[in-house]
Design a protein with these regions (language model features):
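Surface-exposed loop and adjacent secondary-structure segments within mature catalytic domains
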Residues: 1-7, 12-140, 145
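Active-site His/acidic residue clusters
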Residues: 33-38, 119-131, 152-178
Length: 178
């Protein structure tokens, strides 16, 4: 949005309009500031629920990340309908974890890949803290390319954000960064 709070078309929206498939991926939550900048049009980066509601409006083909920060709570802390049925009603298949993605992706028209149920929705674990079945940014990126290149298409646009590296650097956490 610009300073007057008018929506501005994003580069990802321009790619979609040009007939390309579009994916937005991150190692943090899908409704965080950087991924949201490619599909959402909300005046405040902390409007996580409202940002998530913009996801199906953008009608992109693939989204992935840690999860969603406030899937049932509005910016003003009011209870709201879960975003997941809204995504499914808009034609998205929601996969929880890499194995679930592999099982569902072949028949999906549009995909949202997030961590398994019970994992921290704000982000993927750091590599230093990762367990065997944790979703990784490499798996997300591989899945996005696989999904965006299936079938007939005019190419694709893919945004991949390693948001966790930013957090580790801000924390001056050299062991995690290295």
């Amino acid at each position: 949005m610009n300073e007057e709070k008018n929506a501005i078309q994003t580069v990802a929206e321009k790619a979609k309009k040009a007939g390309k498939k579009v994916g937005v991926t991150t190692s943090v939550s899908v409704d965080h500031a950087t991924p949201a900048a490619f599909y959402a049009h909300q005046p405040d980066r902390n409007m996580y629920y409202e940002i998530a509601l913009d996801l199906p409006k953008a009608n992109f083909d693939f989204y992935a990340g840690g999860g969603f920060l406030k899937p049932t709570t509005t910016f003003d802390n009011k209870k709201a309908p879960s975003i997941f049925p809204i995504f499914e009603e808009a034609g998205y298949t929601v996969a929880r974890g890499y194995n679930d993605y592999k099982a569902k992706s072949q028949n999906a028209e549009k995909m949202i890949l997030i961590q398994e149920e019970g994992a921290n929705p704000s982000c993927l674990p750091y590599a230093i803290d990762r367990k065997d079945n944790d979703l990784t940014l490499a798996q997300i990126t591989e899945s996005a390319i696989d999904f965006l290149t299936k079938g007939k298409n005019k190419g694709f646009f893919l945004m991949v954000e390693g948001g966790k590296i930013d957090w580790a650097c801000h924390a001056n956490d050299a062991a995690t960064v290295f």
